[in-house]
Amino acid sequence: MLALERRNLILEKLQAEKRVVVSELSQLYDVSEETIRRDLDKLEKEGLAIKSYGGAVINEDVSIDLPFNVRKNQNVTGKQKMAELAAALVKDGDHIFLDASTTAVFVAKALKEKERLTVITNSMEILLELADVSGWNIISTGGVMKEGYLAFLGSKTDESIRSYYVDKVIFSCKALDPEWGIMESQEAFGSTKRAMIGSGRKRILVVDSSKFDQTAFSVAGSMKEVDIIVTDKEPTERWKKHFEKFNVKCLYPV
């Protein structure tokens, strides 16, 4: 097992259990305790974990970005349910944007029964996922590949996005705040989301409930720019009223 693979597994365990113990990880992955300590040192330097006596705890700061492959394995059931709801909003022949979020990957999977779609995306993962779908037009935005995110970002990406106007923009976000709106942890992601939001007829935000009442670094858009929110469970009455204020339709599994 490569060190990176092991660290990602440790990170997944931290996400699930909030705390890990060096001796237990050493036995689980059949490596020395010193190797595990180096792994935890690396995770701490990346801001993903906080070392403690005999182990480490998860850094729950919402501004920290987990590796793509770790995020992809979080809340899988919730993402699948949201993806099905979002996919049901897409019609055969639609032109759509999909962003580079892990949630959008699940939406891409759920869309495969549709016909004659044109999908424009800045996600390498989605490009690979849809590469074998027949009868579709798959368009890459191009741009600079962001290490660890499988995403194209930057001015060339944003310029490419603005050269299209689509039926539906399907995207997610890092955080959703009643005052600040749609937020991302990095300006590059915020800029790309802003470009997408401004380039579609209907904007569909697919975001799980854990992102509600959170803030992040970059403002990507406001609630008035969203037409439909798809989430994984029924929102609180406060959030329902907030959506109603901006005439945003909210969909969730029942």
What are these regions (language model features)?
Residues 2-5, 12, 19-25, 30, ...:
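Conserved phosphate- and dinucleotide-binding cores of soluble alpha/beta proteins
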Residues 2-5, 9-24, 28-29, 34-100, ...:
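HTH-adjacent hinge/linker in prokaryotic transcriptional regulators
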Residues 118-122, 229-232:
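Short, hydrophobic beta-strand segments that form beta-sheet elements in well-ordered domains
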Residues 103:
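Hydrophobic/small residue at the entry helix of a nucleotide-binding pocket
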